[in-house]
């Protein structure tokens, strides 16, 4: 997630669900109730979180400003300074040059062409 925020020079909010046990998804039948052991390889045991969360808020420089929120339900909040977006794009503007007609031009050849098949 940090690389997406950094390369896009944007604030990134990643909201990830938290689910403490598999029965909430209707998968309780794959856990052996007697032993609490998983019946499928790779499935968490009855004591493990089914989905552990991981929500996070990241600034345009790739720095985590809130989170990650792991192993619990909750709400992440952060004060953001939107001026950081413009500041961060001074040294890397991933799409800005496409908006300049003097620098970038896209040409599509729409004429039909003969197709050659070779063996």
Swiss-Prot record:
GO biological process: autophagy of mitochondrion; macroautophagy
Active site: 21 (proton acceptor)
One MF term in the entry's GO annotations: catalytic activity
Positions of the CN hydrolase domain: 1-82
Pfam family, one: CN_hydrolase
Entry-linked SUPFAM superfamilies: Carbon-nitrogen hydrolase (SSF56317)
Family (UniProt): Belongs to the carbon-nitrogen hydrolase superfamily. Nitrilase family.
Name of protein: Putative nitrilase-like protein YIL165C
């Amino acid at each position: 997630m940090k690389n997406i925020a950094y390369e896009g020079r944007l604030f990134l909010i990643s909201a990830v669900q938290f689910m403490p046990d598999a029965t909430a998804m209707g998968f309780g039948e794959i856990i052996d109730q007697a032993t609490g052991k998983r019946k499928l390889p790779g499935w968490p045991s009855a004591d493990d979180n089914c989905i552990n969360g991981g929500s996070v808020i990241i600034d345009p420089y790739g720095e985590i400003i809130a989170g990650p929120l792991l192993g619990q339900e909750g709400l992440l909040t952060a004060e953001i300074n939107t001026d950081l977006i413009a500041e961060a794009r001074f040294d890397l503007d991933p799409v800005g040059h496409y908006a300049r007609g003097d620098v970038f031009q896209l040409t599509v050849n729409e004429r039909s062409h003969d197709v050659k098949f070779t063996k």
